[in-house]
């Protein structure tokens, strides 16, 4: 036994630390009205305690799940700490899911309370009769801002916390007690819950705060475009508090003008989000001759970042792209592609290519790739197989499931097909369900998409495998055009020196838009169903 002091790792201690050390550091958010509202860690801490004590007075017990359908705002920050700090579980609900899935999640989590934005009141009005566990709905507004609603047992957030105690002391909780709950997007079957503990969350926060995690600086100003319902906002609400970093929360303002306004007014230095958001922002900036002068880096996750986007960020805005990888089951940060001094010395083209990789595992995370027989494959950058992961913030068992989701040695199957090179860089080749099996060989839809998206007339690209009478499957390229040009031959010619000859798509189909799922990813399952017979008609 060591002689070190025992210290239980609780979420409440994190906001207490921020209140004590960084009370004046700002948390800026955009209200539904469009107004920019300024809070800080000191105010968030006090109001989180008011919320925590109010939940305790209401009768919420330790370990009970408290639901939220909330935007990125200061009140959501208060919920992150008030709910988890008092011993309940912060259950963030993806409001972009199908209503039936939202009802399923609320019932599965047995939420007694639901906190929601006023704009989501109609959604919950339609669902409330199918959500028998919910006792009260708390609208994230003041009494004066309360809309007319058919919700039963409804109260404003400000009324709910007004009698709370801002000097409330967080209870001492077991570090393995649950603090957060997120559900997978459920593209196949019902969503599955992933339950995070205080310990796993704080370990993830420490790792994310490291130089090889997110590479943050205490003077950074972070634009948090990633939704706070998505894997606990990628851990940024916690990382911000641990490091005293200014957070800029955009609310519903995700369009180009709204984001540019926040970036310029709040001197944003780092921006976090998915590729679809940045595609819109880059196009807006280009059309309006805007340069994002304050931003030095953007961390992009959710889906693979194309070479063309990395190049555009650098050439047009002098912004470095850090690609990160993770999933709901990994809390989420598992790998990051942080720019190194060696990368800075490379020719730009070579550096951009390296930046398309998902990066190296951060401390605490172990990766390996295996074949269909479970044999570990070499890390030579050529072999690719199932990506397996384990670590202290990796899911072991889904919420309310009877059996573990890991093998006997603790390895979790991510569902991704990947390669790992000799330097430790991991590359997602494809999702196992999306990889195209043509004549017994695999074709990466991700690599094909990234290549196609570099064409100047291509705004978005998606590759799917469709049935073929001879080869089982062949790739078809779906393109959202960037302009009026719809020239298949031009795109085919562009791809010739970028992909293997047998990877060439059998056809190119121009479409108006790609179907986007609740987490910002393209719904390939819908496209495969729509075009499944395209090559055998």
Residue ranges and their predicted role:
Residues 27-73, 77-81, 98-103, 156-159:
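Conserved AMP-binding/adenylate-forming core of the ANL superfamily
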Residues 202-221, 229-269, 284:
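Conserved AMP-binding/adenylation subdomain of ANL enzymes
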Residues 361-388, 422-423, 484-488, 523:
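Conserved beta-loop-beta connector loops within the AMP-binding
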Residues 1-9, 125, 145-178:
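Flexible, low-complexity linker/hinge segments
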Residues 55-60, 164-177, 181-223, 235, ...:
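Conserved adenylate-forming
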Residues 242, 268-273, 282-353, 366, ...:
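Gly/Ser/Thr-rich phosphate-binding loop
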Residues 97, 103, 114-116, 271, ...:
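AMP-binding/adenylate-forming catalytic core of the ANL superfamily
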Residues 14-16, 58, 85-159, 483-484, ...:
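Structural core segment of the AMP-binding/adenylate-forming
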């Amino acid at each position: 036994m060591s002689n070190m002091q025992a210290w239980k790792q609780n979420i409440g201690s994190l906001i207490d630390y921020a209140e004590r050390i960084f009370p004046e550091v700002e948390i800026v958010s955009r209200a539904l009205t469009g107004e920019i509202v300024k809070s800080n860690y000191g105010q968030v801490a006090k109001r989180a305690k008011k919320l925590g004590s109010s939940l305790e007075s209401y009768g919420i017990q330790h370990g009970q799940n408290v639901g939220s359908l909330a935007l990125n705002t200061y009140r959501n920050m208060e919920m992150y700490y008030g709910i988890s700090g008092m011993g309940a579980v912060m259950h963030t609900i993806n409001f972009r899911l199908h209503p039936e899935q939202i009802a399923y999640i609320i019932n599965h989590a047995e939420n007694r309370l639901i906190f929601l934005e006023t704009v989501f009141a109609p959604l919950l009005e339609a669902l409330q009769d199918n959500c028998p566990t919910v006792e009260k709905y708390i609208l994230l507004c003041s009494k004066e801002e309360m809309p007319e609603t058919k919700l039963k047992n409804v109260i404003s957030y400000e009324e709910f916390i007004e009698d709370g105690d801002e000097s409330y002391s967080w209870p001492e909780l077991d570090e393995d007690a649950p603090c957060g709950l997120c559900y997978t997007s459920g593209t196949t079957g019902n969503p599955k819950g992933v339950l995070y503990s205080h310990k796993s969350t704080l370990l993830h926060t420490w790792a994310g705060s490291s130089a090889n995690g997110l590479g943050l600086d205490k003077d950074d100003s972070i634009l948090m475009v990633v939704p706070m319902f998505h894997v606990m906002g990628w851990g940024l609400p916690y990382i911000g508090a641990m490091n005293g970093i200014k957070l800029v929360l955009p609310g519903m303002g995700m369009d180009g003008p709204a984001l540019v306004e926040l970036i310029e007014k709040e001197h944003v230095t780092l921006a976090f989000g998915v590729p679809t958001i940045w595609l819109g922002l880059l196009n807006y900036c280009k059309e309006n001759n805007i340069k994002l002068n304050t931003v030095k880096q953007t961390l992009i996750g959710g889906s693979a970042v194309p070479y063309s986007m990395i190049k555009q960020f650098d050439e047009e805005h002098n912004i470095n792209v850090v690609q990160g990888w993770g999933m709901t089951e990994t809390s989420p940060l598992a790998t990051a592609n942080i720019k190194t001094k060696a990368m800075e010395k490379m020719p730009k083209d070579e550096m951009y290519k390296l930046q398309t990789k998902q990066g190296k595992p951060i401390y605490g995370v172990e990766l390996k790739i295996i074949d269909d027989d479970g044999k570990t494959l070499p890390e030579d950058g050529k072999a690719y197989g199932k990506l397996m992961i384990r670590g202290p913030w990796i899911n072991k068992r889904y919420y309310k499931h009877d059996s573990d989701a890991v093998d006997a040695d603790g390895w979790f199957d991510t569902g991704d097909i990947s390669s790992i090179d000799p330097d430790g860089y991991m590359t997602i080749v494809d999702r196992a369900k999306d990889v195209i099996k043509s004549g017994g060989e695999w074709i990466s839809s991700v690599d094909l998409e990234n290549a196609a998206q570099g064409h100047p007339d291509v705004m978005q690209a998606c590759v799917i495998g469709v049935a073929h009478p001879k080869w089982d499957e062949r790739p078809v390229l779906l393109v959202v055009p960037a302009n009026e040009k719809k020239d298949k031959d031009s795109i085919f010619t562009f791809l010739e020196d970028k992909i293997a000859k047998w990877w060439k798509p059998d056809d190119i189909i121009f479409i108006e838009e790609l179907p986007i799922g609740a987490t910002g990813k393209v719904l390939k399952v819908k496209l495969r169903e729509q075009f499944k017979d395209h090559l055998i008609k």
